[in-house]
Amino acid sequence: ITKEPELCARVTELPVKEYGVDAAILYKDIMSPMVAMNVNVELKAGVGPVFSTPIRSMADIDKLEAFDPTKVDYIAKTITLLTSGMLDVPLIGFCGAPFTIASYLIEGGPTKNYNKTRGMLIGAPDVWDALMTKLADMSIAYLSMQAEAGANALQIFDSWVGAVNADQYKQGIYPHMERIIKTVKAKYPHLPMAMNGVGTDHLVSIWSHLPLDVIALDWRSSIVMANERGVTQT
């Protein structure tokens, strides 16, 4: 479905029609843009995205190609369909954050412990930084493509970044997130940008220093708690 603009647009539209929500979020998988970097992704039923050749070394990272939007032009076409009269509410485009994307690439698929991912972050910082740099470049290009196609807002999903502590985040992840958000905001200052994660209570005060318009909280958090930690973007 995600490669068929008409079908994907209909699925995106369904919650608006059925529940009357005040915005639509693009129906895609967070790993969808990896096709544009020549990464073979298998979406295994009951498991999720799986990679037959996990990334574990600098040589593996060197094989990652720069993001080519023409390889996922169906995503831009879906957005244009939706924002050219199909929707009467704003459309939120999105991408997976570099850490969350990296966790799938390094682990080879979904995991419950992120041991290999944190192992690279802590034990091979040069390899980690090279991977994050490439994924940050992808995020900028992918979000820009969605903005150009007509998305009304942009969200970054860092679903699994709660697996790292605050110091690890500041050292190995924050600089890349800052570059992504600052670059995209500079190009599209009119578009609101949001970010969310799971189990990230210990990170939201760090996120508050990023030029985000919205910080989304999961069920473990409260707006009161976030405000007490200096977060004003909720």
What spans do the regions from the language model cover?
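Alpha-helix boundary recognition
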Residues: 2-3, 17, 62, 122, ...
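N-terminal/domain-start segments enriched in small and hydrophobic, helix-friendly residues
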Residues: 1, 5, 44, 51, ...
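A short acidic, glycine/proline-enriched capping/turn motif at secondary-structure boundaries
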Residues: 30-33, 48-49, 58, 98-100
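N-terminal basic, low-complexity leaders that serve as flexible interaction/assembly modules and, when applicable
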Residues: 1-45, 84, 174, 178-179
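An N-terminal domain-start capping segment
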Residues: 1-9, 61-67, 101, 109-110, ...
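A gly/proline- and charged-residue-enriched helix-loop-helix capping module
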Residues: 46-84
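Active-site loop segments of alpha/beta catalytic cores
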Residues: 71-234
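Short, flexible, mixed-charge acidic loops at enzyme active sites
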Residues: 39-53, 104-117
